[in-house]
């Protein structure tokens, strides 16, 4: 394989869970540690447009829908940003995704509500002063300004959305996920049908990597 499969699976799961609109559109990083190294995904960055903090018209607000595995973008007449869409065609990649969710990510999410409540208590005084200092209520300039209210209401909405999203993810990445897949298996972990894969990096750059076939799927 020409990629660090686990890093791609982890990056996918984080992007899918929070429905980050910027995934592969901007602030997306990957690296190789030398010419002979595989391609690693990460580190994660720029999540201000995640967790239901984006306009619904962008398609990133439904806690009961797949997002990251269906990302596509139309540029210069070409469909790009389809990394996860293509990787999901490979049963081996789906196996890694399912294993990483069930054994690594899911246990971490079990205490998310308690952690959120701890932060709510810690930040209470600062949050109140934030609204006083900046007069944030009902002000334009944020993607979800039409739904802004008290900071407590915002936290409640966040917790409700996360609860729904986590429940969906747990149901989605069961054992059947590996078998049914997203689309028919047609690729290898070493290459996407020997096609070039394009990754958007900022507004003015587009990097292309060609991954050669290595490990058959199925």
Set out the residue ranges of the language-model regions.
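Intrinsic-disorder/low-complexity, polar/charged segments enriched in Ser/Thr/Lys/Arg/Asp/Glu/Gln
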Residues: 204-208
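Acidic, Ser/Thr
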Residues: 209-214
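Short, solvent-exposed loop/linker segments at the N-terminal edge
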Residues: 195-203
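Middle-to-C-terminal accessory/interaction subdomains
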Residues: 1-25, 31-186
């Amino acid at each position: 394989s020409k990629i660090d499969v686990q890093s791609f699976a982890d990056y996918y799961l984080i992007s899918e869970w929070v429905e980050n609109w910027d995934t592969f559109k901007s602030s997306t990083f990957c690296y190789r540690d030398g010419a002979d190294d595989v391609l690693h995904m990460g580190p994660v960055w720029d999540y201000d447009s995640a967790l239901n903090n984006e306009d619904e018209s962008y398609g990133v607000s439904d806690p009961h829908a797949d997002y990251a595995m269906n990302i596509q973008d139309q540029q210069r007449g070409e469909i790009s940003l389809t990394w996860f869409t293509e990787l999901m065609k490979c049963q081996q990649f789906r196996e890694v995704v399912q294993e990483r969710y069930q054994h690594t990510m899911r246990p971490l999410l079990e205490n998310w509500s308690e952690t959120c409540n701890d932060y709510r208590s810690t930040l209470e005084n600062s949050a109140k002063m934030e609204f006083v200092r900046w007069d944030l209520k009902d002000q334009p300039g944020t993607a979800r300004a039409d739904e802004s209210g008290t900071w407590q209401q915002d936290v409640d909405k966040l917790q409700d959305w996360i609860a729904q999203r986590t429940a969906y993810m747990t149901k989605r990445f069961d054992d059947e996920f590996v078998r049914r897949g997203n689309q028919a298996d047609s690729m290898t972990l070493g290459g996407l049908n020997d096609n070039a894969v394009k990754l958007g990096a900022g507004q003015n750059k587009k990097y292309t990597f060609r991954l050669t076939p290595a490990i058959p799927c199925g």
